[in-house]
Amino acid sequence: MFRGANAISLDAKGRLAMPSRYRDELDSRSSGQLIVTIDAVDPCLCVYPLDEWEIIETKLRALPSLREENRRLQRLLIGNAVDLELDGSGRFLVPPRLREYAKLDKRAMLVGQLNKFQLWDEDAWNAVSAADLAAIQQPGAMPDELRDLIL
């Protein structure tokens, strides 16, 4: 399980180092193999261990292909998916096209989302986090099923 928001840096080649606290789990689950694709809702990237991505692919394959919405989602997620592998230093290269989509430059945030990570431009992450916090604090903004989760 991946938790927490981690400030990271991309080097001039577009490589970033996976925080060391996640490396052992990624190595044991998927031998350091990752899939990176766009997030279809937010302006960020999704980084999946290979075993989690295979579950997503199975679900996408099961969608009826005659529905345009399904084909659209498949095109976006699968068409932008890139196979990557952590190198000996725990780094991986984010391809230029995906860096451009998420507007990644030097400073980024790698955010654990339990089964995957989101990779954000740091400024975009800070803005979205502030907006999310403000929105959820509005009276009546939280659905009943979420209120039961709050400790």
UniProtKB/Swiss-Prot annotation:
Molecular function in Gene Ontology: DNA-binding transcription factor activity; transcription cis-regulatory region binding
Single biological process term from Gene Ontology: negative regulation of DNA-templated transcription initiation
Domain SpoVT-AbrB: 5-52, 81-124
Cellular component aspect of the GO annotation: cytoplasm; nucleoid
Keywords: Cytoplasm, DNA-binding, Repeat, Transcription, Transcription regulation
Coiled coil: none
CDD domains: MraZ_C (cd16321), MraZ_N (cd16320)
Subunit and partners: Forms oligomers.
Stored PANTHER family: TRANSCRIPTIONAL REGULATOR MRAZ
Name of the molecule in the record: Transcriptional regulator MraZ
Organism: Pseudomonas fluorescens (strain Pf0-1)
Lineage: Bacteria, Pseudomonadati, Pseudomonadota, Gammaproteobacteria, Pseudomonadales
